[in-house]
Amino acid sequence: MAPTSTPQTPFGRVLTAMVTPFTADGALDLDGAQRLAAHLVDAGNDGLIINGTTGESPTTSDAEKADLVRAVVEAVGDRAHVVAGVGTNNTQHSIELARAAERVGAHGLLLVTPYYNKPPQEGLYLHFTAIADAAGLPVMLYDIPGRSGVPINTETLVRLAEHPRIVANKDAKGDLGRASWAIARSGLAWYSGDDMLNLPLLAVGAVGFVSVVGHVVTPELRAMVDAHVAGDVQKALEIHQKLLPVFTGMFRTQGVMTTKGALALQGLPAGPLRAPMVGLTPEETEQLKIDLAAGGVQL
């Protein structure tokens, strides 16, 4: 059974978009994935996103995706929400991935906006609702036009929110004004998908965040959202400002590269990256050490 959720926080408040650990020869490291998932939940995560962008989903097979979700559910599914990334730019393929994720025990689905083919808003609506219809799991949309090439407009979000299983949105649009209107009008549970904007989005109505830096600072993120919910705005701001070097450092290059580099520095499961992604250079690793130390991360 998944942890308790509410309509306001269907996936909890603090989630980390987990990397996919690989062995030295590039194979899926299921044991490492289970150990990393347990570490992240022990640190304070309410949920984990599996097979997202940070999970190198473009380079894993459908079978690997299912195996990874199954392994993480076995490891932490009784105490954390396991949300499977199943979004592609092919609606039928996404439906197949959604059904597979449901079969292996996922608690929810993350659906990224179709990328490259740039469908119109009606196409986005049909795509998302078809997937939500095909599986019996709650859905978190993922609006990231910088990668997908097309935004989910507010009117479309309002329509999508009428679907009983579309309950949340991960916002990586970087537009607080649009977010403010969309939160107010759609009623969707709003999750920040941009670590630098975690606190600003909480201020305009977000309920939590899907984080990359949660791999290294989950306790601090937990403390920040708890302070905000308790009305201690000053404490939340102090934590946000303390973490600024981490937010900056973890995104000097692609987030999965710095995340796996940071995990390696901490002796946690990560492994190499699959092409076309590559590991950090020695110079990038040294800069990452400086950034993490400036944010109080112990290595």
Swiss-Prot record:
GO molecular function annotations of the record: 4-hydroxy-tetrahydrodipicolinate synthase activity
Main subcellular localisation: cytoplasm
Feature type site, description Part of a proton relay during catalysis: 53, 116
Catalytic reactions on record: L-aspartate 4-semialdehyde + pyruvate = (2S,4S)-4-hydroxy-2,3,4,5-tetrahydrodipicolinate + H2O + H(+)
Positions annotated to bind pyruvate: 54, 210
GO cellular component, one term: cytosol
Gene Ontology BP, a term: diaminopimelate biosynthetic process
Record keywords, A-Z: Amino-acid biosynthesis, Cytoplasm, Diaminopimelate biosynthesis, Lyase, Lysine biosynthesis, Schiff base
Enzyme Commission numbers on file: 4.3.3.7
Secretion signal span: none
Active site: 142 (proton donor/acceptor), 170 (schiff-base intermediate with substrate)
SMART domains on file: DHDPS (SM01130)
HAMAP family, per the entry: DapA (MF_00418)
Function: Catalyzes the condensation of (S)-aspartate-beta-semialdehyde [(S)-ASA] and pyruvate to 4-hydroxy-tetrahydrodipicolinate (HTPA).
Assembly: Homotetramer; dimer of dimers.
Family statement: Belongs to the DapA family.
The protein's name: 4-hydroxy-tetrahydrodipicolinate synthase 2
Organism, as annotated: Streptomyces coelicolor (strain ATCC BAA-471 / A3(2) / M145)
Lineage: Bacteria, Bacillati, Actinomycetota, Actinomycetes, Kitasatosporales
